[in-house]
Amino acid sequence: MFSFRKFLAFMLIVIALMASFSSAQPIDEERPIFMERREASAFGDIIGELKGKGLGGRMRFGKRSSSPSDISMAELRAIYGGGPVEYVQL
């Protein structure tokens, strides 16, 4: 029969083996998932607005007004160090 210490040692070995064969992959391996971007065209914005309206959305032409509390990306980079942008796999 196993003593408690032998059982504990066995469980630690099993856990260590499971951790060494983990299925977690680093970010850069396997196939990264990229977001698809549409090509810019002369009528791309208008077509997008019309599609949105046809699907029950509201039409928004022009730039949205921003509130004074909005912070631009340049200001965020200045505040948080301005390092390179890191992409995260989804």
UniProtKB/Swiss-Prot annotation:
Taxonomic superkingdom: Eukaryota
Subcellular location: Secreted
Residues the record lists as Phenylalanine amide modifications: F61
Leader peptide range in chain numbering: 1-24
Regions annotated as coiled coil: none
Keywords from the named record: Amidation, Cleavage on pair of basic residues, Neuropeptide, Secreted, Signal
GO biological process: neuropeptide signaling pathway
GO cellular component, one term: extracellular region
Propeptide stretch(es), residue numbers: 25-36, 65-90
Protein family according to the UniProt entry: Belongs to the FARP (FMRFamide related peptide) family.
Function statement: FMRFamides and FMRFamide-like peptides are neuropeptides.
Protein name: FMRFamide-like neuropeptides 27
Gene: flp-27
